[in-house]
UniProtKB/Swiss-Prot annotation:
Intrachain disulfide bonds: none
Source taxon at top rank: Eukaryota
Entry GO CC: extracellular region
Family: Belongs to the bradykinin-related peptide family.
The protein's name in its UniProt record: Beta-scoliidine
Length: 14
């Protein structure tokens, strides 16, 4: 999973 407009990196693989 990846978040763009949250608090993580734009290409953060979760």
């Amino acid at each position: 999973d990846y978040v763009t407009v949250k608090g993580f990196s734009p290409l953060r693989k979760a």
